[in-house]
Amino acid sequence: MKILVTKNKEVASQNAFELLQTDIINGAQVLGLATGSSPLGLYQKMTSSSADYSNLISINLDEYVGLKPTDPQSYHYFMEHHLFAQKPFAKSFIPDGSNLNATEVINHYNKILATYPIDTQILGIGNNGHIGFNEPGTPFDSQTHKVKLTPATINANARFFTSSKDVPTEAYTMGIGSILQAKHIILLAFGEQKADTINKMVNGKITTAVPASALQQHPNVTVILDEQAASKLA
């Protein structure tokens, strides 16, 4: 696990962009993408660059169950607004949150992941150590599944909604086993509130209680932090 500690989010996002572009130059064709605040700076670098992604494929980690793609709080909408409208990809896949047939959604997404193995996966990390929507206790060999979100995750995401009561309680997510199949993983984390979790991920016991600790088992992970998120690392 390679750790890059940067001065701030701006520098971190630039470093992530440069790493991603290097992977693409070296042949990466399928990008695993994340939502939330952590990758926003990276997406801003991508959209403001001259880079062309129209021959690449993107596969997103997750989506809320029950939200249509046109819902402003859906991850479909997030990705369209922050990246795809400015930088289209050849194909972009996101779980269909409007489809309440979980078996159908899960089987379809697992087929996509089998057809298009991910070269570079972008990740954020939750305060409880979740990656994607893989909450504590998720098996490390898990594939795509429907998850019931913990109160901690719902409260953390409430800032994007009118209130915590409006946050969906379930999501479709790629599993930890799916994430670990990526050839290169780039994880971004910022702020003092992530410091304890980052330390557990990097230096702690490998345990399902901290889903991101599974990344210790992966041979090619780059963790990009600001000084605050890195403040608890030895």
Swiss-Prot record:
CDD domains: GlcN6P_deaminase. It is an enzyme of class 3 (hydrolase). The active site is at D62, N128, H130, E135. GO terms for biological process: carbohydrate metabolic process; glucosamine catabolic process; N-acetylglucosamine catabolic process; N-acetylneuraminate catabolic process. Its EC number is 3.5.99.6. One of its GO terms (molecular function) is glucosamine-6-phosphate deaminase activity. Belongs to the glucosamine/galactosamine-6-phosphate isomerase family. NagB subfamily. This is Glucosamine-6-phosphate deaminase. It comes from Limosilactobacillus reuteri (strain DSM 20016). The lineage of its organism: Bacteria, Bacillati, Bacillota, Bacilli, Lactobacillales. The gene is nagB.
